[in-house]
């Protein structure tokens, strides 16, 4: 009768997310779902519950409706607050001028009580706590990476990708598509030398500085060190004030900057790992599922930061909103091959549907 879902799309590939969406759309019971995937919420939600200042506020509609309605509410609250502030200022001025004048003292006291009774409307916090930015990287060569006859995998007997021949050009913003287990992470690891090519070559352009983020990189964070300690380890000569200012843009302000990693949530650790990548000013970003564990505000801030990033990037993500906002080229990994995908995410969904139909037909033939 009731489905309680807590981040159900984490670690699912796009094919499985679409399957889950279709199931939830046809589900006749009640669904209470926590998710940071806005496109996912748009498909089946009829109401959004938002935690605001220790209260729950209900909005009718899906996530896109919620964004619009909340923006309208904020606008109206701001207008009301300006009117109330003007009224308060006028009343306060009256009190200051006449509170000690006998003929007006009683009126002034009444005005003071009115001021105490008047409660300012609490305007919803529309400002994101995150204001992240990837610094402009140093200008580099036109060919960032040249992949020739590349076989990727873990050994001669465990080759995942075969005969990859692709080139990454300065300014490229690549979204990697493919089902889980097809080799997206394997390709990323090979590009950043975590894995050696089984055969073939990966040639990086001169002066290329890679910024690599993956979920397993969180394990490389030292539990006893703070966010501030991690940046100090990278840049011994930096002033603490500058490091704190930078960390503040990732919402590590005040005591948060000195909190030990072992006491951080998964989302905070992911933010710190991204901060470390951003601080090093890479000219090639390799991002493997960067939005896992991130809340919607941080996802939006990351999307904005990546949209203005001037280096090249390759992104693995099942967050369609992020892919559509960032990637201007798509590479498809399927059945051990990597190739450019001519189409958008809607075309990719149709590609997946076609693959599923073909798979079912083969099963029926066997039966």
Give the label of every model feature segment.
Residues 72-163:
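Flexible nucleotide-interacting loop at or near the entrance of a catalytic core
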């Amino acid at each position: 009768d009731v489905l309680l879902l807590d981040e159900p799309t984490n670690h699912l590939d796009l094919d499985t997310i679409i399957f889950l969406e279709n199931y939830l759309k046809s589900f006749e019971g009640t669904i209470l779902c926590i998710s940071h995937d806005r496109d996912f919420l748009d498909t089946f939600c009829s109401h959004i519950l938002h935690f605001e200042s220790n209260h729950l506020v209900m909005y009718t509609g899906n996530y896109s409706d919620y964004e619009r309605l909340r923006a309208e509410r904020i606008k109206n609250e701001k207008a009301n607050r300006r009117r109330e502030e003007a009224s308060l200022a006028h009343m306060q001025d009256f009190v200051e001028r006449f509170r000690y004048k006998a003929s007006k003292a009683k009126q002034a006291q009444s005005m003071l009580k009115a001021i105490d009774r008047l409660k300012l409307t609490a305007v919803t916090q529309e400002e994101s706590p995150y204001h992240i930015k990837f610094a402009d990287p140093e200008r580099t060569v036109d060919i960032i990476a040249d992949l020739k006859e590349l076989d990727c995998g873990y050994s001669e007997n465990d080759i995942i990708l075969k005969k990859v021949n692709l080139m990454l050009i300065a300014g490229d913003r690549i979204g990697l598509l493919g089902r889980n287990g097809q080799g997206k992470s394997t390709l990323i690891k090979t590009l950043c030398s975590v894995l050696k090519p089984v055969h073939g070559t990966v040639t990086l352009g001169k002066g290329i500085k890679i910024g690599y983020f993956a979920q397993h990189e969180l394990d490389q964070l030292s539990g006893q060190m703070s966010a501030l300690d991690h940046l100090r380890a990278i840049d011994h000569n930096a002033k603490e004030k500058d490091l704190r200012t930078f960390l503040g843009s990732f919402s590590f302000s005040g005591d948060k900057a000195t909190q030990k990693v072992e006491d951080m949530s998964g989302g905070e650790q992911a933010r710190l790992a991204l901060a470390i990548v951003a601080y090093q000013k890479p000219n090639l970003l390799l991002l493997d599922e960067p939005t896992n564990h991130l809340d919607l505000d941080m996802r939006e801030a990351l999307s904005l930061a990546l949209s203005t990033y001037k280096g090249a990037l390759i992104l693995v993500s099942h967050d369609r909103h992020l892919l559509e906002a960032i990637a201007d080229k798509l590479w498809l990994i399927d059945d051990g091959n990597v190739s450019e995908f001519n189409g958008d995410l809607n075309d990719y969904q149709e590609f997946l549907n076609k693959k599923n139909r073909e798979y079912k037909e083969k099963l029926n033939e066997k039966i």
